[in-house]
């Protein structure tokens, strides 16, 4: 008669049986692994012994975090500059007329600092990065366009332009800022890292977009569509990891909110088909005209204005600043700055803008760029596009929440037409307005608007990049 096992003995027997099954499964797994990947463990051991390789990866991701932090700081400074200008503008009637003196004087001051200390900071920043990505450019010229020092100079000058009340944005400049910060990582990387200046600048530029718009996906698409057309990436995995890391820094600071908050854009209905088509065509033509004006203004024409700008750059900048201030006075300050508040109010169906807002915002943004002051056109383009969508909605008899889909289409259409990047525009606007219900509508509008824009002009950024060298002399 067998003696029954004690509970402890039963547990020990079960444990031994489980251990035998585990060893058998492990052996089977190892045998299968050796058959399919005979060099697996050797490669793992080799990977773990490459200490410098892991140091390079740590440096890459560390500078990605630094890029995100710098862009976050840039965002906070830019918002502070906008609020400071609005505080000046809100000093009653005296403040409104003080702006007529404040804006031209500060515009001249920012232009003087730009021409004296950082001539490569003028303009958006995206053309500078595109030019720096040219393999035929020597190191000295590339460093003049993209460097850590240039990044901080760009931040200061753009904030100065926003403090002046000019119609400029900070999103385009973050491309140059991010590329400059990330390019500084090259001195800390080993020659075996395989990451050259091209990869670092692409990673930094796209990381800047990801952190600026709080959308890592937008940064990745921007890198693929705008920055790698001439040459691909040798280490795309680490470039994408850097973009995501910078975007995570922005999310950690500002939260997992979309650019304009949690907005719920309605799904397009068949009743909006004709107004939506009209928005796509109008934003495409208007965006192409705007891009053409920016390029022609930078290149110059044989006319009196171009001669005056070349001979008396500071007087010309003062004139542009005065015109922008007058436009702001007419619109009650709605055209000053990037246009975030106005665009958000339109998307919430709460804004009551003057009928000429879209045209005046268009002119204010063009004059701000023509003055030569550093600043981008991303956010102003969104505001102009939102205005076009709102105007067409009004002409179609729509208002309030019913107009929101057309406003979103106007944003994506004008941005795609201006920048020449329909996929980037579609992704950014979709993430900014949480418009996943309008995915196909936004994509179709971006592609159609971009096609109409190409009837008027070539890529604005490529045209501006071709004008960068020789660099202007310091004065």
Feature names for model-found ranges:
Residues 1-475:
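Alpha-helical transmembrane segments and immediately membrane-proximal extracytoplasmic
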């Amino acid at each position: 008669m067998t003696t029954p096992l004690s509970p402890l003995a039963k547990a020990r027997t079960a444990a031994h049986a489980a251990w035998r099954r585990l060893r058998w499964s492990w052996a089977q797994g190892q045998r299968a692994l050796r058959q399919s990947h005979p060099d697996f463990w050797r490669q793992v051991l080799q990977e773990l012994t490459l200490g410098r390789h892991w140091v390079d990866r740590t440096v890459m991701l560390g500078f990605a975090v630094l890029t995100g932090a710098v862009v976050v700081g840039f965002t906070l400074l830019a918002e502070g500059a906008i609020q400071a200008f609005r505080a000046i503008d809100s000093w009653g009637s005296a403040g409104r007329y003080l702006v007529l003196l404040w804006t031209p004087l500060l515009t001249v001051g920012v232009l003087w600092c730009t021409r004296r200390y950082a001539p490569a900071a003028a303009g958006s920043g995206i053309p500078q990065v595109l030019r720096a990505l040219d393999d035929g450019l020597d190191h000295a010229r590339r460093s003049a366009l993209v460097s850590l020092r240039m990044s901080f100079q760009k931040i200061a000058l753009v904030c100065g332009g926003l403090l002046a009340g000019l119609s400029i944005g900070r999103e385009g400049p973050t491309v140059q800022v991010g590329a400059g910060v990330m390019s500084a990582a090259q001195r800390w990387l080993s020659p075996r890292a395989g990451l050259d200046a091209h990869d670092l600048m692409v990673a930094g530029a796209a990381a800047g977009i990801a952190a600026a718009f709080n959308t890592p996906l937008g940064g990745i698409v921007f890198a693929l569509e705008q920055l790698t057309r001439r040459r691909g990436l040798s280490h795309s995995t680490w470039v994408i990891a850097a973009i995501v890391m910078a975007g995570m820094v922005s999310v950690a600071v500002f939260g997992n909110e979309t650019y304009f908050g949690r907005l719920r854009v309605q799904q397009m209905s068949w009743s909006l088909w004709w107004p939506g088509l009209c928005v796509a065509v109008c934003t495409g033509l208007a965006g192409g005209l705007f891009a053409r004006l920016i390029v022609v203004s930078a290149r110059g024409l044989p006319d009196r204005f171009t001669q005056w700008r070349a001979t008396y750059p500071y007087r010309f900048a003062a004139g542009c600043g005065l015109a922008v201030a007058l436009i702001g006075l007419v619109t009650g300050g709605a055209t000053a700055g990037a246009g975030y508040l106005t665009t958000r109010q339109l998307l919430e169906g709460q804004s009551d803008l003057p009928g000429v807002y879209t045209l005046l915002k268009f002119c204010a943004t063009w004059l701000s760029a023509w003055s030569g002051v550093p600043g981008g056109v991303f956010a102003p383009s969104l505001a102009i596009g939102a205005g076009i969508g709102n105007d067409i909605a009004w002409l179609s008899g729509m208002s309030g929440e019913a107009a929101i889909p057309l406003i979103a289409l106007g944003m994506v259409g004008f941005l795609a037409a201006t920048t020449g990047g329909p996929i980037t525009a579609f992704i950014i606007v979709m993430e900014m307005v949480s418009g996943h219900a309008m995915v196909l509508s936004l994509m179709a509008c971006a592609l159609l608007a971009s096609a109409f824009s190409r009837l008027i002009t070539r890529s604005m950024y490529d045209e501006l990049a071709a004008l960068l060298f020789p660099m202007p002399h310091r004065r």
